Amino acid sequence: MAQIPSSRTNGSGAQMRVFGLHVYGNFYECANTELLKSPEELEKVVLEAAREGGMTVLDIKSWKIGEGVSVVAIILESHITVHTWPEYRFATVDVYSCGGHTNPHRAFEVLAEALKPARVEKGVAERHLE
Protein backbone atom coordinates (compact mmCIF):
# COMPACT_ATOMS: atom_id res chain seq x y z
CA MET A 1 0.00 0.00 0.00
CA ALA A 2 1.01 3.64 0.24
CA GLN A 3 3.60 4.96 2.64
CA ILE A 4 3.19 4.45 6.38
CA PRO A 5 2.12 7.74 7.93
CA SER A 6 3.67 7.42 11.37
CA SER A 7 5.11 5.31 14.13
CA ARG A 8 3.85 5.40 17.73
CA THR A 9 4.07 3.45 20.95
CA ASN A 10 1.14 1.58 22.44
CA GLY A 11 0.10 1.57 26.11
CA SER A 12 2.81 -0.93 27.03
CA GLY A 13 5.54 1.07 25.29
CA ALA A 14 5.81 -1.22 22.26
CA GLN A 15 6.41 0.44 18.91
CA MET A 16 3.44 0.41 16.47
CA ARG A 17 3.43 1.18 12.78
CA VAL A 18 0.36 3.18 11.83
CA PHE A 19 -0.73 2.06 8.37
CA GLY A 20 -3.89 4.06 7.95
CA LEU A 21 -6.39 6.47 9.37
CA HIS A 22 -10.10 5.65 9.29
CA VAL A 23 -12.46 8.61 9.77
CA TYR A 24 -16.09 7.53 9.96
CA GLY A 25 -19.38 8.87 11.14
CA ASN A 26 -23.11 9.32 11.10
CA PHE A 27 -24.77 12.41 9.64
CA TYR A 28 -28.15 13.20 11.24
CA GLU A 29 -30.91 15.51 9.97
CA CYS A 30 -29.20 16.24 6.65
CA ALA A 31 -30.61 19.42 5.10
CA ASN A 32 -29.55 18.47 1.56
CA THR A 33 -32.16 15.74 1.07
CA GLU A 34 -31.94 15.90 -2.74
CA LEU A 35 -28.26 14.94 -2.56
CA LEU A 36 -29.18 11.98 -0.36
CA LYS A 37 -31.29 10.66 -3.28
CA SER A 38 -28.99 11.31 -6.27
CA PRO A 39 -26.29 8.76 -7.18
CA GLU A 40 -24.80 11.06 -9.84
CA GLU A 41 -24.57 14.13 -7.60
CA LEU A 42 -23.32 12.16 -4.61
CA GLU A 43 -20.56 10.64 -6.78
CA LYS A 44 -19.46 14.19 -7.68
CA VAL A 45 -19.25 15.10 -3.99
CA VAL A 46 -17.25 11.95 -3.18
CA LEU A 47 -14.83 12.77 -6.03
CA GLU A 48 -14.44 16.30 -4.65
CA ALA A 49 -13.86 14.91 -1.13
CA ALA A 50 -11.13 12.63 -2.46
CA ARG A 51 -9.52 15.51 -4.36
CA GLU A 52 -9.62 17.82 -1.33
CA GLY A 53 -8.18 15.02 0.81
CA GLY A 54 -5.27 14.47 -1.58
CA MET A 55 -6.46 11.00 -2.58
CA THR A 56 -6.26 9.24 -5.95
CA VAL A 57 -9.57 7.74 -7.14
CA LEU A 58 -9.18 4.46 -9.03
CA ASP A 59 -12.89 3.73 -9.48
CA ILE A 60 -16.26 4.88 -8.21
CA LYS A 61 -19.61 3.09 -8.28
CA SER A 62 -23.05 3.99 -6.99
CA TRP A 63 -26.32 2.18 -6.53
CA LYS A 64 -29.83 3.45 -5.95
CA ILE A 65 -31.33 1.34 -3.18
CA GLY A 66 -34.95 2.25 -2.50
CA GLU A 67 -34.92 6.00 -1.92
CA GLY A 68 -31.30 5.91 -0.78
CA VAL A 69 -27.92 5.69 -2.42
CA SER A 70 -24.69 3.82 -1.77
CA VAL A 71 -21.45 5.18 -3.23
CA VAL A 72 -18.14 3.34 -3.05
CA ALA A 73 -14.94 4.99 -4.24
CA ILE A 74 -11.85 2.84 -4.40
CA ILE A 75 -8.88 5.10 -3.89
CA LEU A 76 -5.23 4.21 -4.35
CA GLU A 77 -4.87 4.71 -0.61
CA SER A 78 -8.00 2.64 0.38
CA HIS A 79 -11.69 3.72 0.12
CA ILE A 80 -14.49 6.22 0.70
CA THR A 81 -18.09 5.07 1.20
CA VAL A 82 -21.37 6.90 1.70
CA HIS A 83 -24.73 5.22 2.40
CA THR A 84 -27.90 7.32 2.61
CA TRP A 85 -31.44 7.00 3.96
CA PRO A 86 -33.29 10.11 2.71
CA GLU A 87 -36.50 9.12 4.46
CA TYR A 88 -34.62 9.60 7.76
CA ARG A 89 -32.37 12.44 6.50
CA PHE A 90 -29.47 10.18 7.55
CA ALA A 91 -26.15 9.10 6.04
CA THR A 92 -23.14 7.07 7.10
CA VAL A 93 -19.67 7.96 5.86
CA ASP A 94 -16.32 6.15 5.90
CA VAL A 95 -13.02 7.62 4.73
CA TYR A 96 -10.08 5.27 5.13
CA SER A 97 -6.65 6.19 3.84
CA CYS A 98 -3.26 4.54 4.12
CA GLY A 99 -1.36 7.46 2.63
CA GLY A 100 0.58 9.83 4.86
CA HIS A 101 0.21 12.44 2.12
CA THR A 102 -3.61 12.38 2.43
CA ASN A 103 -6.05 14.13 4.74
CA PRO A 104 -9.07 11.90 5.49
CA HIS A 105 -10.37 14.49 7.97
CA ARG A 106 -10.65 17.04 5.15
CA ALA A 107 -12.40 14.52 2.89
CA PHE A 108 -14.89 13.84 5.71
CA GLU A 109 -15.47 17.60 6.14
CA VAL A 110 -16.21 18.02 2.42
CA LEU A 111 -18.91 15.34 2.67
CA ALA A 112 -20.40 17.02 5.75
CA GLU A 113 -20.37 20.44 4.06
CA ALA A 114 -22.31 19.01 1.11
CA LEU A 115 -24.90 16.98 3.03
CA LYS A 116 -25.39 19.68 5.69
CA PRO A 117 -26.19 17.52 8.73
CA ALA A 118 -27.55 19.20 11.85
CA ARG A 119 -25.50 16.76 13.94
CA VAL A 120 -22.44 14.63 13.24
CA GLU A 121 -21.13 11.65 15.19
CA LYS A 122 -17.49 11.24 14.18
CA GLY A 123 -15.01 8.53 15.02
CA VAL A 124 -11.35 8.06 14.20
CA ALA A 125 -9.38 4.82 14.25
CA GLU A 126 -5.70 4.32 13.56
CA ARG A 127 -5.04 1.07 11.74
CA HIS A 128 -1.74 -0.22 13.04
CA LEU A 129 0.56 -3.16 13.36
CA GLU A 130 2.20 -3.74 16.74
From Swiss-Prot:
Write the Enzyme Commission number(s) for this entry. Answer: 4.1.1.50
Q: Name one GO biological process term.
A: spermidine biosynthetic process
Residues annotated as carrying Pyruvic acid (Ser) in the record are: 78
Chain positions of site Cleavage (non-hydrolytic):
77-78
Q: How is the cofactor bound?
A: Binds 1 pyruvoyl group covalently per subunit.
Q: Please give the InterPro entries that the UniProt record associates with this protein.
A: AdoMetDC_fam_prok, S-AdoMet_deCO2ase_core, S-AdoMet_deCOase_pro-enz
Q: Does the keyword Iron-sulfur apply?
A: no
What's a Gene Ontology MF term here? adenosylmethionine decarboxylase activity
Pfam families attached here? AdoMet_dc
Q: In which pathway does it act?
A: Amine and polyamine biosynthesis; S-adenosylmethioninamine biosynthesis; S-adenosylmethioninamine from S-adenosyl-L-methionine: step 1/1
Q: Which residues form the active site?
A: 78, 83, 98
SUPFAM superfamilies, per the entry: S-adenosylmethionine decarboxylase (SSF56276)
Cofactor names from the entry are:
pyruvate
Q: Which reaction does it catalyse?
A: S-adenosyl-L-methionine + H(+) = S-adenosyl 3-(methylsulfanyl)propylamine + CO2
**Modified after translation how?**
Is synthesized initially as an inactive proenzyme. Formation of the active enzyme involves a self-maturation process in which the active site pyruvoyl group is generated from an internal serine residue via an autocatalytic post-translational modification. Two non-identical subunits are generated from the proenzyme in this reaction, and the pyruvate is formed at the N-terminus of the alpha chain, which is derived from the carboxyl end of the proenzyme.
One GO term describing the cellular component = cytosol
Q: Which UniProt keywords apply?
A: Autocatalytic cleavage, Decarboxylase, Lyase, Polyamine biosynthesis, Pyruvate, S-adenosyl-L-methionine, Schiff base, Spermidine biosynthesis, Zymogen
What does the UniProt function comment say about this protein? Catalyzes the decarboxylation of S-adenosylmethionine to S-adenosylmethioninamine (dcAdoMet), the propylamine donor required for the synthesis of the polyamines spermine and spermidine from the diamine putrescine.
Family to which this protein belongs: Belongs to the prokaryotic AdoMetDC family. Type 1 subfamily.
Subunit and partners: Heterotetramer of two alpha and two beta chains arranged as a dimer of alpha/beta heterodimers.
Protein name as catalogued: S-adenosylmethionine decarboxylase proenzyme
Origin organism is Aeropyrum pernix (strain ATCC 700893 / DSM 11879 / JCM 9820 / NBRC 100138 / K1)
